[in-house]
């Protein structure tokens, strides 16, 4: 018996991916696998627009609420866990519906991507350089040992620069040698991208941001501080949470925190759009389509008829 082929619903934030994934899973007999890095965290609900259990229509969801805010989310750990989930769903005869917009997490799941081992002592040494000398010094060192990697990573992205230096030192090879191999998606996954008109999407982001603050984002952050949010590495950097933490620290007023959350989200959406639009395997649909699920299913049917898996 042939296993069901997964469907991935990807694209920018606030386009309507979650609702489409629910519709597809409901119609096709599927289970959902989250691919939003910040929705991995327990208690980070309002600021990540995580669906409440009552909104999930009784459909099983995987890779939600699997980390404490003190734990570090990593692409490598996610890949291992999500691959098990997708293959387990397919083995049960259900359709895995993968949904989210965290770019590297999407790539790790759908493409062949082997992650080099880590070395805590090597990483700690480079993290110390980052802390003591700043991101410019780390970027300059990467430029010396691996110019191609230095050119491909934002000079302000300290975490990725440190990781690149760690990989180069451990493997003795350029960082690009561990890059994903783009080709046929893993499991022959059908990839659907959801997007909207830019002005419309900006309005949706503005509304979503306002509602997050009205519905208790500040109280959510305060509660998470009590369980270690400030001690985390990745969780406190999430858009919305970082801005509320800065407000609590007196860096600016609450209106400014909300505005910065909107601007940060809009900027992130532009990055997502640029990233996903480069992937020619994605079949794009308009999130404003009133018959979006029907259109998507039709698109998937046409894909199969064209001979794609």
UniProtKB/Swiss-Prot annotation:
Cofactor: Mg(2+)
EC assignment: 2.5.1.75
Alphabetical keyword list: ATP-binding, Magnesium, Nucleotide-binding, Transferase, tRNA processing
InterPro entries the UniProt entry points to: Dimethylallyltransferase (IPR039657), IPT (IPR018022), P-loop_NTPase (IPR027417)
Site feature Interaction with substrate tRNA, where: 102, 123
Any one GO biological process: tRNA modification
One matching Pfam family: IPPT
Binding site for substrate: 13-18
Catalysed reactions, semicolon-separated: adenosine(37) in tRNA + dimethylallyl diphosphate = N(6)-dimethylallyladenosine(37) in tRNA + diphosphate
GO molecular function: ATP binding; tRNA dimethylallyltransferase activity
Highest taxon listed in the record's lineage: Bacteria
Binding-site residues, ATP: 11-18
SUPFAM superfamilies with a match to the protein in the record: P-loop containing nucleoside triphosphate hydrolases
UniProt KW Cytoplasm keyword: no
Assembly: Monomer.
Similarity annotation: Belongs to the IPP transferase family.
Annotated function: Catalyzes the transfer of a dimethylallyl group onto the adenine at position 37 in tRNAs that read codons beginning with uridine, leading to the formation of N6-(dimethylallyl)adenosine (i(6)A).
Matches recorded under PANTHER family: TRNA DIMETHYLALLYLTRANSFERASE
Protein name per the record: tRNA dimethylallyltransferase
């Amino acid at each position: 018996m042939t296993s069901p082929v997964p469907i991935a619903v990807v694209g920018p934030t606030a386009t309507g991916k979650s609702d489409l994934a629910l519709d597809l899973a409901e119609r096709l007999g599927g289970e959902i696998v989250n691919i939003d890095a910040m929705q991995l965290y327990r208690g980070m609900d309002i600021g990540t627009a995580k669906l409440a259990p009552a909104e999930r229509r009784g459909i099983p969801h995987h890779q939600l609420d699997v980390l404490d805010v003190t734990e570090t989310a990593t692409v490598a750990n996610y890949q291992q866990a999500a691959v098990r989930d997708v293959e387990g769903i397919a083995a049960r005869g259900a359709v895995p519906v993968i949904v989210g917009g965290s770019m590297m997490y999407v790539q790790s799941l759908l493409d062949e991507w082997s992650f080099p081992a880590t070395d805590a002592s090597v990483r700690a040494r480079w993290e110390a350089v980052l802390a003591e000398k700043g991101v410019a010094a780390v970027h300059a060192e990467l430029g010396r040992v691996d110019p191609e990697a230095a050119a491909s990573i934002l000079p302000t992205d300290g975490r990725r620069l440190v990781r690149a230096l760690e990989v180069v030192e451990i493997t003795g090879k350029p960082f690009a040698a561990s890059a994903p191999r783009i080709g046929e998606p893993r499991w022959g996954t059908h990839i659907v991208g959801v997007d909207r008109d830019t002005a419309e999407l900006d309005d949706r982001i503005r509304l979503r941001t306002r509602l997050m603050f009205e519905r208790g984002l500040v109280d959510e952050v305060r509660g998470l501080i009590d369980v270690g949010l400030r001690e985390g590495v990745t969780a406190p950097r999430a858009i919305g949470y970082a801005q509320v933490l800065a407000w609590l620290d007196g860096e600016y007023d609450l209106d400014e925190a909300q505005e910065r959350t909107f601007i940060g989200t809009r900027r992130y959406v532009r990055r997502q759009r640029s990233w996903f639009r480069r992937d020619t395997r994605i079949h794009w649909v308009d999130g404003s389509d009133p018959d979006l699920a029907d259109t998507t299913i039709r698109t998937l049917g046409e894909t199969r008829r064209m001979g794609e898996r």
